Structure formats: structure tokens, C-alpha cells
Amino acid sequence: MARLYPFRALRYDPTRVNMTGVVTQPYDKITPAMQDAYYAASPYNLIRVILGKHNPTDTAAENVYTRAASTLNEWRAEGILKEESEPALYGYAQTYKVPGTEEIRERRGFIALGLLHDYADKVVYRHEQTFPKHKSDRLALFKATRAYCEQIYMLYSDPTFTAEKAIFESGAAPELEITDEYNVLHRVWKVTDPTLITRVLSAMDDKWLLIADGHHRYETSTTYMHERAAELGLDEAALSKNLSSRPELPSQNLSSRPERSAVERPAGEPAQLPAPAFPEAAMMMTFVNMDAPGITILPTHRVAFGLIGFNGREFATKAEHYFTVEEIHATPSGHYPGAENLLKHLNDTPGIAFIAATRDGDFLLTPKPEAIAPLLTNLSPRQQQLDVTQLHKVVLEKLLGLNEETIRAGQNIRYLREASDALQQLGSGNADVAFLIKPVTLAQMRDISLNLEVMPQKSTDFYPKLLSGLAMYTLD
């Protein structure tokens, strides 16, 4: 099952930089405006590595990927980035307010290397589809930089909370605290005590993993692993044996360090801890126990644009064949129903439902099971019961006439976390219709994943995101 490793992370030297100014959200959540803000925040902001700006004069020899590699090497040479003196795991806690509420939650996990597996091994499970374009971009970056600067968000199940107890019950103060632009507090603890590390690794031995965020990076890393294995002369049979058994692996010597961290190994002889058979066989991941409180999944709303001749009332009439359609009128005070009111209507409706907001009116759609059943026959019962599946298959494809390829390419669809942003695009004329949906539940995601099925793209939005720049894994 899952195999984890401590590692000597490459990290920013907090005496050389303001940490708040150098970390970022994950690359695929960074808008052009956010990219500009990160560039302005610090000359050492990680944006220059994970999502640098393209230049009109870029060539095969000089481009966004070669600049990322040069930047990373320069920062290492300057001492802006330093490699840890010994392998460690990193406790990682995020304290945040659930969007749209006053509820405060804390999500706890830990950063380590995780051995890469093909999905066929049934150790790591996915829940969303991926796209070749996004993977080719990340592969080019990984090859140029020879570093993994962002974590993959992994879920596992452990009702005994063994790993969390080993990492977080020491009572030690975090060595790093950062509050991000969403007012999320991120705290990090370094764990170097080999006894604690071994306890955590052992606790994960029998676990399977679900990818919460980072499908493209995970699959790209797996591709890179296979390429590197071929270069090393490992055929597929040997590689499969290496990844599925527990061979004698090279060990990392934990030499003493001049400074002490928050959670450290005691004085004594250097300890031996396992390492991957070769660097590309593992990827940096954050592991979060799905049995613990603190996990939040937000909905990802959709707006459709470029629909020639679209009329909201004609759409509602057409939708009545498949849905019970209820128009949501102005509030008693006469105000137009905004995002908060529309979401209240949606969330007060039991079962599967979504809002179709148009410039001609806003409509609550609840499915007629007998009518939609013929459109879902090629899907499993689990997939059929997802709001997002019914939205895609019945509304986007059947009623709007879009197809899977155009949806995947984003030719007529945008994805938005905030319902207010979706309505703003509608009001400004940048969208023809906004679809507000309910979030996928953790139980639904788990069932889909473990049955080797997938959801439509952008089905889950785990909040908050893992910060990029807290730790990095270098392959050289």
C-alpha cells in the first residue's frame, strides 16, 4: 500500500525573505491578476518558478521553463533557498473560516514524499478527469527545474489518528506561521525525530490514498517516473516489483545539525531512514486524514457563454421536460434575488437541484428521475446521483447542445468558486446563463474514487488550498 519517506526539503531562508511575500496559491488557481500581484510581492516569489510569464520572444532555448530553472538555481546559489541538513516530515495545519459562514475550522496534515503508483496498482485513486495540455506543461517544468515545488493533496483514512498524534501532540510551537490572502493561517512544524518519523511511516503502511487536489501533477510525476526508470534500465516488470514490494532501499544518514527544530530527534547515534529507490519514484505530498474534522469541499459553479440566441425563458420551458422548474422571483422587499438568496433557495431544496440564473429570470431546477434516466444509462448509479453529473449530461449537453469535447476545452464554460462572481459575469454580459450547484460530499468522492470511476472536471473544490513554497523536493 502507501509508502512514505522523509526528505531533505529545499526551503526559503526566513532570515533572507518575508515568507508571506514568497509563497503562492497552487499554480492552477492563480489568475493573471494574482500572477501580477505575486510578481510585485517579492523578487523571490515562487510564481517565477511555478507559473512564470511568457515572453513574445520565447524560443526553444529561452522560455518560461528555462527561466524557471535558472531562477531556482540562482536562488539556491544566493542562499535564498537552502536544503535542510537532514530528512524530516512537516506537520501542516490550516485554520480558516468556511466561506459564506462564520464557522472556524482547522485542517491538519503532514508533508512527506509519497511513492508514485499507477492507478492500476490500486494504491492511489483519482476522482477527476485530466487533460493532456495541462500535463505537458507541468512535465516541461519538472524536467527543466528538476524540482517539485508544489504538493499534491492526498486523503487517507485512519480512525485511530496515529500519524496526527505522533506529529501534533508534542505541544511544540510551530516553526513557521503565514496568513495568506484569504486570511487562512498556515502553520508548519518540522519533525526530525526518527522514532516519530518511523511511527508515522508505519501508520501509513496499510493505507490507500485518494487524490483531492493535484491530479495533473500526480499523473505528470508518474509519467516522469516511468521515463526516468527507462533511462536507468529498469524495465516495467522490475519497476512494478520495486514499487509493489518493500526492497532494501538506500538510506538517508541523519547527521546532527547545529540548530534545533520544534519537534526533533534526541541526541544519539545518527539514525537510518528509508528513501526512494530513485528520486523520481516519489513526489511531495500533503497527507490529510479524511476521518478528521476540518475538511471542506466547496461547489464549483458554472457559467455558459457564447450561446447564440440564448433566451432564459425558452430555456426554462425546454427544461420542463426533464426538471420541475420553479421561478425565483424578487424578494418581498422588491430587491432582485442576489447570490445569497439564490443559494438559500438551492440549499433549502432537498436532494439534487441547481439554479439556472439568466437575464430573463432565475429558475430552480429539480430533476424528474424518469425523464432524465435515459440520458444517464452509460453511467454508474453512483455517478448518476451526482448533481454535477446531471448538470453536465442533462443541462449542458442535452439542453444547451454542448458536447464533452467543447466542455473539456472550456470553449463555452467557465468555472467559478463564488456564486456572486457567476452572477456578476451574467449581469455584465460576459455569460448567458449561470448554474449554481451544491458541493460534492466527501462520501460521494470516496465512493466514486474507490470504484475506479471519475466525475466531470472541476467537480470538487477543496478549501483552503495548500500553499506553494513551504517546502520543495529537489531531484538532484
Predicted regions and their residues:
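Surface-exposed, charge/polar-rich loops and edge strands
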Residues: 1-242, 273-476
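A cross-taxon signal for low-complexity, glycine/charged-rich
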Residues: 241, 245, 249-252, 256-275
